[in-house]
Amino acid sequence: MFLVLATIIIALIRSASTQSLAGCYESIVSFGDSLADTGNYPMLFGADTHTPSYVLPPYGRTFFHRPTGRCSDGRLVIDFIAQSLGLPLVQPYITGRDRSFSKGVNFAVIGATALDFDFLGSIGFPNTFTNVSLGTQIDWLKEFLATIPDGRKFLQKSLVLMGEIGGNDYNHPIMQGSSLEEMQPLVQLVIHYIGSTIEELIKLGAETLMVPGNLPIGCFPFCLAAYKDSSSAQDYDPKTGCLNWPNDFTIYHNQLLQKELSRIRELYPHAVLIYADYYNAAMRFYLSPAEYGFSKDIILSACCGGGGPYNYNGTGKCGIPPARSCDDPASYASWDGIHLTEAAYRLIAQGLLQGPYAIPHITTACPAFNRDDDQLYHY
């Protein structure tokens, strides 16, 4: 009886915590890559002969029942955050230039990098997927702010989501088979650019920014498949089956990112920088799949793929025959080998909104908790 009562109380506390977020922010401003893009990529490159499978079924099958430009079977972390804040799903900027962005605007683009397209090419790590970088997205933001009456106030009352961004600066080299030694010099450059962009956003008016770290890519099918033939047994974590060195690399990136956020907090004490610990929020279900509703024997395999190790190969991508989708995406963490399922993104979002994986907790930065009602800005 006590256990049942305790379970009910915990559920009520979590529900109240999530509900209390409604009214915290009047809009969301989002940057990033495929972890956050809600539809920009198809409008940017839809007529291109290299149109990716992401805009084809079965993408979007679980929630939207059609492809939306999201790289998943359903909703992303940004969607769950928007819903928890009582806001509509965030509109992609490119597809909605004639729409209202009063409740949010999304500049994220599938495949985007933190570092500039030309710069990456010049150092031997070309982005063959898109020429959009974080700098491009900031230019779009400035273009947008110039079209509204008070762009500074709009940013002040918004929750700014900084991606995740930076993962593709490493993912593209990984897909090309680059070594750890080759990628290591990129990290300081990526962190510096993310940091300088955050400072620029604060100067433009942003006061609350959520900055995610990178996910454990050593657990992703595309990475596991890429290094399968060159890895030995000791290269894998016996508890999860994930590759150790890519995860260690991600931890290194995330540690430097947190140090950069600490530096910026000292320079701009009025701004609230929330570190979103995507890595540990995700590692929960790789360490204990069954506890979170996933099947242990397929936790490292893609739901939708063309076969091969981990059901991922570069020539049989999800959305393009003969690749096939699994019957139950909710039992998988990986959707297409590169991106996660809605079920996995939901767990990460819950870890940020209800758990210990947002530092500081998102409610501590809620303007509604710190301002009188008549001070709230309505755009």
Language-model-detected regions and their locations in the chain:
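Conserved active-site regions of diverse hydrolases
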Residues: 1-379
